[in-house]
Every structure is written in structure tokens, then in C-alpha cells.
């Protein structure tokens, strides 16, 4: 499903090329609007921001509740998507990361169920599974984020602007979340 005809045409070509026409059907659709509950046992949503993805999951709630697995790859705001996944009664079962064309990507797999332990804010933002797996690509991402926050904190510490103090507190909170996740790489070594 896609909202635009161009990407849908590309998908159709790939489906034909890989001889999957008997297994895959394409539809022009805004999110899951053209999908009926129970029609799909797996849902993949990728290549868009987390706000839009969260909204698609909410609008397609009935379809989501009838599926057995979702694979989600938000380009931004992964915390909003993870929170929505939990709100819908799914748990995150796996995470994968890659680095391509100068950008880090994370995808996560979800299945119906409740997390054994609730997520904290750091885990909503940065995930729980990749740091636990000590994923080397994701570690580089976290180190890059740590360096960005360190520079921002240094700049804000030197600033005399009234808004700098509030921004500094936010940057320090964000740094603590990053360090929490990086700490998982040091555990059990």
C-alpha cells in the first residue's frame, strides 16, 4: 500500500521481477485505510517519520489488532512509535540497525503481548534490544549522539542567553539517556 502511484508502480515491478504476484497485492491507500481487519497477518511500515507512523497505527488500529506481527522503521521520533506499539498491546521482540548513505536506520519487530518490564524514557527513545545485543552499528550511532550532545552542552554552558539554561537542562537529560543506553554495552563484558 502506498499513498502515491509512483512508489506503488515500483513495488509492482519488483513483485513481478521476483515472481511474487500470487502472494502480494498492491493497493493505493492512505495508510491502512484500504485494508480490512484480518486481511493481513503481518504489517510493515517504513520510510516515514514517527509522527505519521503513529497516526497510521492509530487510524489502522482494528487491522493492527488482528495481525500477528509488525515490522516498523520510523525515520524520526521512534519513541512515539514505541509508545503507540505498547498502547496497542504489542511488545517489541527484536531490533535491527544499519548505516547506509551517511544515515543510521533502526527497525523493530513487534508481536501481540505485554513487555515483561516497562520501558523507561531512554528505552523509548533509543530502544532496549540493540544495546542489550551490543550491536556495533548502533553503538556508533549512540557515540555520535553522545558527541553531539557534549558539544551542545559545552556551547550552552558558555551562553549568556536566558533560554540557554532550559535548553541545557534538556540536553543534559538527553545525554543521560544516551549514557544509560551506552552503559548496556559495558555490562557483562
Regions picked out by a protein language model, each given a short descriptive name:
Residues 1-41:
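S-adenosyl-L-methionine
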Residues 33, 39, 51-189:
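Class I S-adenosyl-L-methionine
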Residues 47-48:
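Glycine-rich, N-terminal phosphate-binding loop of Rossmann-like dinucleotide-binding domains
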